């Protein structure tokens, strides 16, 4: 169960050939959990938006990350896909599209580290129900002409990893720790801070 207080993101790669969408939560330590997947082809934008909204439910999303090409105007409507998603109730955020830097960032998220209990882990964890991400990510190969990039064929293998790349390119933030200290509406009610370097540090922590 993902706590309600964690920051939640939706990241997607959209096309008629495939919609790959992932809901990701980031905890207080900065670990990310990919906890839900939508992987379906032949969805027009209104159908895709309807499914995304239904699966999100009452969850509050920090951002919905999507590739920059969704902001290109479509010849049939004169509107961009991002604008059409907005009309359906989904405001997209343009993710960075530097492929190489995105893969570098994803490798950092996947490298072995220690979790909050000191056990071997990675900063990015994938729930078992995200079957297509688990299936396609390990099959992604290096591009023969640019080993720093991932191959774009077979194309079916690229949708889920690309969606994940947009997430890490968006520089997701960890969940803010709850501030249990009392807040004061007026400065005159705030306790006087001690002088010196310690006092400066404490004042910085209050805001």
List each model region and its residues.
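Generic recognition of flexible, low-complexity loop/linker segments
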Residues: 7-11, 21, 51-55
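Stable alpha-helical structural segments in soluble proteins, enriched in small hydrophobic residues
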Residues: 159-167
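Anionic group-transfer/hydrolysis microenvironments
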Residues: 13-15, 69, 164
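ATPase catalytic-site recognition across NTP-hydrolyzing enzymes
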Residues: 1-12, 17
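Short beta-strand scaffold segments in enzyme catalytic cores
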Residues: 19-25, 165
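Residue-level detector of short, conserved catalytic/binding motifs and their immediate flanks
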Residues: 19, 62, 161
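Conserved structured core elements
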Residues: 15, 157-158
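Mg2+-dependent endonuclease catalytic cores in nucleic-acid-processing enzymes, primarily RNase H-like
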Residues: 28-153, 172-189, 196-207
């Amino acid at each position: 169960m993902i706590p309600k207080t964690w920051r939640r993101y939706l990241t997607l790669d959209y096309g008629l050939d495939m919609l790959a969408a992932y809901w990701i939560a980031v905890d207080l330590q900065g670990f990310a959990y990919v906890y839900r997947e939508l992987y379906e082809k032949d969805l027009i934008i209104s159908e895709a938006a309807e499914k995304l909204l239904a699966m999100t439910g009452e969850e509050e999303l920090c951002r919905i990350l999507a590739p920059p090409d969704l902001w290109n105007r479509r010849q049939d409507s004169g509107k961009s896909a991002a604008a059409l998603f907005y009309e359906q109730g989904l405001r997209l955020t343009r993710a960075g599209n530097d492929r190489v830097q995105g893969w570098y960032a994803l490798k950092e998220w996947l490298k072995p580290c220690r979790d909050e209990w000191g056990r071997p882990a990675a900063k990015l964890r994938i729930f078992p129900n995200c079957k297509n991400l688990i299936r396609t990510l390990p099959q992604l190969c290096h591009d023969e002409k640019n080993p720093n990039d991932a191959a774009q064929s077979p194309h079916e293998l690229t949708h889920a990893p690309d969606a994940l790349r947009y997430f890490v390119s968006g520089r997701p933030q960890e969940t803010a720790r709850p501030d249990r200290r009392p807040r004061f509406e007026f400065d005159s009610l705030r306790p006087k801070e001690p002088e010196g370097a310690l006092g400066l540090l404490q004042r910085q922590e209050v805001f």
